[in-house]
Amino acid sequence: MEQYNVTGMSCAACQTRVEKAVSKVPGVTSCAVSLLTNSMGVEGTASPAEIIAAVENAGYGASKKGEKGSTSQSASTAEYEEMLKDKETPIMKRRLVSSVLLLIPLMYFSMGHMMWGWPLPKFFEGNHIAMGLVQLLLTIAVMVINQKFFISGFKSLWHKAPNMDTLVALGSTASFVYSVYALFAMTGAQVQGDMDAVMSYMHEFYFESAAMILTLITVGKMLESISKGKTTDALKSLMKLAPKTAVLLRDGKEVEVGIDQVKKGDHFIVRPGENIPVDGVVLEGTSAVNESALTGESIPVDKEAGDRVSAATLNQSGFLTCEATRVGEDTTLSQIIQMVSDAAATKAPIAKVADKVSGIFVPAVICIALATIVIWLFAGESVGFALARGISVLVISCPCALGLATPVAIMVGNGMGAKHGTMFKTAVSLEKTGKTQIVALDKTGTITSGEPQVTDLVPADGVSEEELLKGAFALEQKSEHPLARAILALAEEKGLAREEVSDFSALPGNGLVAKRNGKELCGGNRALITKKAVLSKQMEEQAAKLSEEGKTPLFFSEDGKMLGMIAVADVIKEDSPRAVKELQNMGIRVVMLTGDNERTARAIGAQAGVDEVIAGVLPDGKEAVISRLKEKGKVAMVGDGINDAPALTSADIGIAIGAGTDIAIDAADVVLMKSRLSDVPAAIRLSRATLRNIHENLFWAFIYNIIGIPLAAGVWIPLFGWKLNPMFGAAAMSLSSFCVVTNALRLNLFRMHDASKDKRIKNEIPKEDLNMTTEQGMVKTMTIEGMMCGHCEARVKKTLEAIEGVASAEVSHEKGTAVVTLTAPVSDDVLKTAVEAQDYTVKGIQ
């Protein structure tokens, strides 16, 4: 998506106009304009020149943002800072101060002496023409100061795309023109000596309304501008963390350079108390690094040689020498800024209603204002009265509140997520996450730590735990198996010395054999150990119990004598059960997907407390499972992104957990920087809060106009005598957008991890509908040889789906696999026989 800066927009009507203009350009497939950040995202093949020309022809300005791929982090960050810099507020403050200084004497001359009896200078006493001329000049001065409304308003009207400025300009101009007419008419009456007419025309002056409308709208726009600036505070705080310089090591000397001069592969140093300038890997030194700026985790992370560090994180204690691995726009910080900015430039589906209304809002208001004037004139009221009602309609109507209702909440919500290490890639993902009904959790790396650990040491009679661990350590040190690494980690933690072994041999599917001090050392599963030693009944019972708990028992013997048993398991994360419980309390069904066997899977599922367990699912089969779950409701798939890409893409919302510094996971809609499962309910909680805030904003924006426009038009005058002065209408308009933005800012007070106020959604999915497991496992993956083309795929698919109990089969001749989804137990032999009857070879079924 190409990003552009857009200038000249003042309200939702402008935004809609720009979108329509760019969408008509040949080659443009999608266009999203953000009124909040004055930016535009465009997808398609159209050239930048064509897009910019379309925007300019619509009456606005556009320029392309910095080219992607720049190696300058400072340049890219500076561009974002420039984009988010509050340029409007200082200008509006000057305009407002000047307008108020002129408005005070104008109000004094127009109303002070009549309403409160304030004295006038003697020159003006009885000099009605002088009074009118002073008001005329003061009003012209205020109009010149606020000329932006007239330039923008009439320019957009000329382009047949009236906006909020058009309403203000028309209202102020109508008041001014009618007042000028009244001044000339009064002057004529004065010349003719008709004092009754003079007094009558004096009361027809609306100069103060023309000036007051402009001043009050400026007040509102300034308040809105200040509030809008606060919606990007989270991004601004991140940008401030970006270092401007780095200390490089060149020819053994320390050289301080600008951050834009750092290149990949450069060596740099970071002293205690300094921010790390770019992403890199530690070469020398140890330290504690505070990564809260990126992940929201307040506890410092220990770093040593080989560990990765990220730009903008704080080196708290040690002296580090690092090698730059990511610079410029590739750093984690730049990617976070880019992601939040891109999300702000996209449209949430809920915004479509406001966009449709905004497209016709201003023309409709102008028509209502004209109709109001005509109706009151036909009703016998004076021109001044009818004009006041029409002007009130123009100045009270506010398309800005509608246009800002969604983007300000999206921006604040995204900022909140960014501060806590939760990245929503688009406004769509921020909206859809809160509508989740089913959460599918990949077991490894999501519910569990993803790294097997030793959970139990069970020595045989007469053997100590240390002797058992020493024997296992000696045997496993030459193995690359993940279970072996768990034993090695425990042995090293306990400081055990390495013992050399000889004649090492790995027995695939069974275990390991070697010699230590001339004695045969064996380790592995029950099938191997029963051939080497006598396994006691007590140890067999303990092994069965450990297996039921989801642990893998490894047996060890030496020269026919049992040393004991070590249980290894991929243990669940500390916060997983709490996170699952929080999801369930929110009315969400939780499903665990794993390739483990049924017994191990159910043991882990029971510990985590999930609603359903789907076992025997290999990576290729996850996508099919997600497709089935989507038939039941809105599905969020949570995985570590390593082998979950198809499933993450297939789900309604893909959530990548534990991304750390690698946040550019294309398959995911939401990226969680930390490995905490509790961030999943927190993300859903934030999405729901943001949606709720958007609904509130839209409600107040609509209700304001629904109530305000009839009141301004004088609908209630015949019944209750309620009449709205144009100045009060302008005041109401000026506050409407401010109120919407202020309401969105309340999201900054929202606590993402506070589960005490969670509301349970009404989830119509019966629990049994999620029960997709069978004794054989719900999904089986077949490895098939001989398939050469799409015709082969279709043939195998048809054969498998003809078998009773097979719901569907996803076949790929390129991968040589068939992922079979079952609704009832089907034996492997039945599947194999059916496929091989078609002259293909089944190499395996899992």
PLM feature spans:
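ATP-driven catalytic headpiece of P-type ATPases
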Residues: 92-94, 313, 437-480, 510-591, ...
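Conserved cytosolic catalytic loops of P-type ATPases
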Residues: 26-43, 204-205, 236-330, 428-472, ...
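Flexible metal-binding regulatory segments at protein termini and peripheral loops
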Residues: 1-130, 228, 253-254, 338-346, ...
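Conserved ATP-binding TGD loop and adjacent catalytic N/P-domain core of P-type ATPases
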Residues: 16, 346, 424, 436, ...
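Transmembrane helix-loop-helix hairpins at the membrane interface
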Residues: 91-245, 356, 721-726, 732
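Membrane-embedded alpha-helical bundles of multi-pass transporters
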Residues: 115-129, 158, 177, 416, ...
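Juxtamembrane coupling segments of multi-pass membrane pumps/enzymes
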Residues: 186, 194-197, 211-272, 303, ...
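Conserved catalytic phosphorylation-site environment of P-type ATPases
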Residues: 294, 353, 388, 401-475, ...
